[in-house]
Amino acid sequence: MASVLILNGPNLNLLGSRSPGVYGTTTFAELEELCRREAGQLGLEAVFRQSNHEGQLIDWIQEAGPEAEAGRSVGAVLNPGALTHTSIALRDAIEAVRLPVIEVHISNVRGREDFRHQSWISPVARGVIIGLGIHGYPLAIRALHLLSGSA
């Protein structure tokens, strides 16, 4: 069974309690269940992870590249959180391993503060989904499945 990696960056573990007017009231555990259900319906195994540390996210991306190249993974859904706007290292890791990535943001970052408009990840992502709340995650999982040719 092929997998789909779902990576969540800093502070996403606080979903449901952090700024519910911006990010909604769905908890991180509920988001994980939503992703696992969507992946399962597509015959994929969801590998769901979160870290507040840039280096850990980079390690997971580097590990996932060979899995995708070998056909054991359809790619990664990545919500880098605030690292979107600051992490060239995360961008470089994605580019280096040629991992298919769909960048996801729960809120519409284009409608928020100016500093959130810059993404270092978008240029190396296969696609970007923003502003659709938690629904962006299952859409990204489905997109990776379709783009992999597994559908």
Where is each model-derived feature located?
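Extreme N-terminal starter segment of soluble prokaryotic enzymes
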Residues: 1-4
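Short catalytic helix/loop segments, enriched in acidic residues and glycine
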Residues: 21-40
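Short beta-strand elements at the ligand-binding edges of bilobed clamshell
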Residues: 116-134
